[in-house]
Amino acid sequence: MRKIFNKKIAILFFSLICACLVNAAPVKSENEAVKLVIKSVIKHNIYGVKNENDLKCFRFYIDETAEEFEIDVRSNNEKCGGDPNVEPRLFSYIVNKKTGKLATDSFEYAKKKGIDWDGSYLPID
C-alpha cells in the first residue's frame, strides 16, 4: 500500500513540474513580445481591435529591462488622419521575459472586467 501511495505522489510531483515547464514560455525578443501583446489586444477586443488589420492606427514603443519588455501602445495619428506630430499613449503592457506573462494598464480592459481600476497593471492573457 505504501509503495502505491509513494508512486502516486511521485507521479503528481512530476506532473506539476511538467505543467510549470509547459506554462513557462520565455520571451527572447522585442518581436516576440509585440506579437504577444497584439494577440492579447485582439483576444480582448481592446479599442475595438478584432484582427491585425484593425491595428493600422496603433504604434508600439518598446523599452527593455533585464526582467521585462515594457510596451506602450500609441495612436498613430498620421496614418489615421490626425496630427503627425502627436501620438498619444493609449495603454501599456508589461511582458515578463522569463514567463511570458502579460500585464496591462488598459482602463478599457479593467472596465470590461468590472475592476475598479486604480491605474496599476492588471494581469491579462
Role assignments for model-derived ranges:
Residues 2-11:
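Bacterial N-terminal signal peptides that target proteins for export
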Residues 11-20:
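Bacterial N-terminal signal peptides
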Residues 21-23, 60, 83-84, 124:
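General secretory precursor processing signal
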Residues 25-58:
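Short, non-transmembrane alpha-helical segments in secretory-pathway proteins
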Residues 53-98:
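Exposed beta-strand-loop-beta-strand "reactive/processing" segments of non-cytosolic proteins
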Residues 101-125:
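C-terminal partner/receptor-binding element of secreted or periplasmic proteins
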